[in-house]
A protein has these predicted regions:
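RNase H-like two-metal-ion nuclease catalytic core shared by retroviral integrases
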Residues: 107, 129-151
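C-terminal His-loop and adjacent cap/lid subdomain of alpha/beta-hydrolase
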Residues: 27, 43, 68-75, 79, ...
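Short, conserved catalytic/metal-binding motifs centered on acidic residues
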Residues: 7-8, 57, 100, 140
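Two-metal-ion acidic nuclease core segments, chiefly of the RNase H-like superfamily
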Residues: 112-128
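Active-site- or DNA-interface-adjacent structural scaffold in DNA-acting proteins
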Residues: 1-20
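Extended hydrophobic secondary-structure segments that form protein cores and membrane-embedded regions
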Residues: 5-6, 94-101, 129-134, 168-169
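C-terminal accessory extensions appended to soluble enzyme cores
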Residues: 156-224
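Electropositive, glycine- and tryptophan-enriched low-complexity nucleic-acid-binding patches
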Residues: 31-98, 102-103
Length: 224
């Protein structure tokens, strides 16, 4: 079975009693107090990384509290597979990912490819990645079928804690039956991890004939 999904990181969100654009129905005379200035405090920001299953109209969102890195992105994909992918597609023989061309899953990032190789070896499944060309990230279906509805669902609600954010994401649904699961990823991911030429050479990557820099398949180590 060839399985296709879309993934991306939503923009970072402030955690705390800050203004969140939109309106919410409340009792008259009972407005919710928020801070005037949105200076980042000790709770910081979160980076929601989404995995959207086009076939099932289901999604997983890992809410990161650290840096939005390639390691974080691949960990979100790993968690999706453990929690949703493997139970839904037990006979899968390969995976296809459509991803943005930049960000934590950018096509230029060596760490993205190295971390994917580790995941491929764990799953013993080849993973094909198709990056959207530069300047076309809004073509990513995850923007229109997941992130836009998450934004609608929490509009007007201050994102006061990590758990509130996770709960609001998981409560997102649509008239077409979108189902979302979410979890906080409390791991700390280091910025600026370097991947040497020697490490990159261990990635069993086969570029496709059409724009191999954007389209490629990573196979389990030693299989090709």
């Amino acid at each position: 079975m060839l399985w296709k999904r879309f993934d991306s990181t939503k923009k970072k969100e402030l955690v705390g009693p800050y203004k969140n654009g939109g309106r919410e129905l409340r009792a008259q005379g009972d407005p919710e107090d928020v801070q005037v200035h949105d200076f980042v405090d000790e709770t910081g920001k979160v980076a929601p990384y989404g995995v959207y299953d086009l076939h099932k109209n289901e999604a997983w969102v890992s809410v990161g509290i650290s840096h939005d890195t390639a390691e974080f992105a691949v960990q979100a994909i790993r968690t999706w597979w453990q929690e949703m992918g493997a139970p839904t597609y037990p006979a899968a023989r390969s995976l296809v990912i459509t991803a943005d061309g930049g960000g934590s899953n950018g096509y230029r990032l060596r760490l993205w490819k190295l971390e994917l190789q580790q995941l491929v070896d764990e799953l013993t499944l080849p993973i094909t990645v198709c990056h959207l060309p530069p300047g076309t990230s809004k073509w990513n279906k995850i923007e229109h079928r997941l992130f836009s509805f998450i934004t609608q669902n929490w509009r007007g609600k201050p994102l006061i804690t990590h758990q509130v954010i996770v709960n609001l994401i998981a409560a997102t649904t649509t008239t077409t039956g979108l189902a979302v699961r979410s979890r906080l990823d409390a791991r700390l991911y280091a910025k600026g991890r370097r991947v040497s030429d020697r490490q990159l050479a261990t990635v069993n990557l086969v570029p496709h004939r059409f724009h191999g820099e954007w389209n490629y398949t990573i196979h389990p180590t030693g299989t090709i």
